[in-house]
Amino acid sequence: MKLTIRDDPDLLTERIRALKKLKSTEVKVGLPSSAGGRLHFILAVQEHGSPIMHIPSRPVIHPALAKNENRDEVAKAMKAAIASAWKGKNPRADLEAAGQAGADGIRAYIDSHIPPPNSPATVNGGWIWNRAAKKAVYVKGKGFNKPLFDTGNLYNAFGYEIKE
């Protein structure tokens, strides 16, 4: 059996060019650079923990994106981006869908109550020893036990950036 493929050489060249452009495009999911230094610092402390501040490590980005349902959703959008580029369409909407799926996956992971739970002092407030000031200080509790969520600033800041 013999197979012959006939295609427009210019169309094939254009498809290859579109796929190469897509290959050099990055969809970065997490805290965008516009989130500001304070939120990046808070996320770093939460991800890695802080023995001095008695904050346990609560990794969020990598575990959230590694969950099968999140990975599958992002992969589905990326496959659609490749198909769009191959058809000569702009894959931007599919790349945005991939980024949004990743950001939504991070928020869903936070909503699933990342262990360990908040300490009683974090939830209810109370007196704690401030090592830096070398004195006891009163900390107002946040009133609920949802790790990685207090004001909603960090939670709502998760997003994506597309770098071409």
Predicted segments with their positions:
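Short, Lys/Arg-rich flexible segments
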Residues: 1-164
